[in-house]
Amino acid sequence: MTTELCTYTRNACDIARRTGVERIELCAAPLEGGTTPSAGLIHYARSLPGLRLSVMIRPRGGDFLYTDDEVALMAEEIRLAREYGADGVVFGLLTPDGEVDETRTAQLVREAEGMEVTFHRAFDMTRDPLRALEAAVRSGCRRVLTSGGRNTAQEGIETLRALAAQAAGRIEIMAGSGVGPSNARLLAATRVDALHFSARRERESGMRFRNPRVSMGGCAGVPEYTLTDADESVVRQILAELG
């Protein structure tokens, strides 16, 4: 069972290295569900020994229906990820009707030749996950990251089981969303190939002065003084559950 830690910070990368997680998915912007990380963070993650590195390729938050210009930007980000030594890239593209965009996905898979391609949880926004799996196979993806089309992997466990059976070794199924110590073994029993988790914890900002009249994102609901990182103890508990 391969383990992958979703990482947004240098500290989370260090936790992955210390605990023995096999692969990291490197992202920015957790409140957006993950976007392309900074060059500096990619460079740092690549410097750590013993970790396989997959880089998120997502130019913005929101939906997964991209313009031609956005796809061109994603292709450039894939080229840069290769230059920095990434082992893989992570992306997902959909059609307006909720299907995998096979044409554009295959285009970016070709751009990523020599690297592993993960089709991310855009997969869970498709109309039919079993049909979407075949589209991901045809597009040349190495794996899909999925919660079984539900908010959490535990809620989607029966679909995960069906996806693992349908994949039949043609493509890897990686379960993610809400994976923790309490359900890691249960999810592993579905015969998926990998588990993806963030072991997320939040901590309060150290700022003593907080201007209540300003919201940097223009949205008062965004927790500007709450910082998100990985919790090393939770990572270790998950790994212990998996043996």
Question: Where are the language model's segments positioned?
Answer:
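Hydrophobic faces of well-ordered beta-strands that scaffold small-molecule active sites
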Residues: 3-7, 24-26, 53-57, 89-91, ...
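Active-site-proximal loop/turn and secondary-structure-junction residues that shape catalytic pockets
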Residues: 9-11, 28-30, 57-61, 95-97, ...
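Glycine-rich phosphate-binding active-site loops on the catalytic face of alpha/beta enzymes
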Residues: 23-35, 80, 84-96, 141-154, ...
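Alpha-helix-loop-beta-strand connector modules within alpha/beta enzyme cores
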Residues: 34-61, 100-122, 155-181, 216-243
